[in-house]
Amino acid sequence: SNDTTADDAGEETTIIVFAAKSLNQVMEELITKFQETHPNVNVQGSYDSSGTLLTQIEEGAACDVFFSAAVKQMDQLDETDGLVVDGTRHNVVNNQVCLVTYKESNTEVTSLEDLNKASSIALADGSVPVGKYTRQALVNAGILEKADDVSTIPTATVSEALGGVEINECANVGAVTSAVAEGSNEVGTVYYSDTYGLEDRLEILQVIPYDLTGDVIYPVAQVQNPEAEELESTTAKEFIDFLITDDAKTIFRKYYFDTDVEN
């Protein structure tokens, strides 16, 4: 593999990476690993929900790499907006959605099937990928009625389908994780990876199978950044290539991501 031009010239460069909130912890370790072989590269990570990041890119925010928690946002950037650099898009990891509670909650809930027994549920809004996947799972489990686009199913409709249970609508998966870990809500749905580091506070009630949620693919791609110089652009490509190496996969697995995907 050829080292970056950045290192040959001793030139420093910065690449801007927009990554889904659920990638925050693993990305910090991945960036550190990448910098071992690219000491002159500064990787600037910005983390938020995939939908928010997509909007920022569409509104002209400078960005070199978009790492989304869902295919939907990447398709929008790629096919609708035409802002993805050809040939740079890869599926990186899969992530399982989990139903969680806090330790010693004594909840009666065991799975989605008896979710209506919860005193309260933390649930991400349908525009947030984990909220969309949860709605899809509830539709496939026969709890929610089908919709053309499950992400448009309002929180109130989910509550009604569960017999009027109180739902705390969250703006991103981090808010769901906090609400349950703190005991503000009895149960919630988060990614398996969100339970990393919270093993002593969260209990997984159910790892929701992919046949209910569908695949939870995280795609990455280089974003057309007119402000980027050539060095920044080639380095962005190298960072994307790094994300599908065995070294990177080992790190992803440590944070409970599923690397068994076609890159």
Residue ranges and their predicted role:
Residues 58-59, 90:
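Short glycine-biased active-site loop of nucleotidyltransferases that positions the nucleotide triphosphate
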Residues 45-55, 62-78:
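Ligand-binding clamshell of periplasmic/extracellular solute-binding protein-like
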Residues 72-85, 90:
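Acidic, polar ligand-binding/catalytic clefts
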Residues 6-32, 36, 42, 51, ...:
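Exported/periplasmic ABC-transporter solute-binding proteins
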Residues 60-61, 183:
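Active-site charged/polar residues at nucleotide-handling catalytic sites that mediate phosphoryl
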Residues 98:
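Multi-pass membrane catalytic core of lipid/isoprenoid biosynthesis enzymes
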Residues 1-2:
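Sec-dependent N-terminal signal peptides of Gram-positive bacterial secreted proteins and lipoproteins
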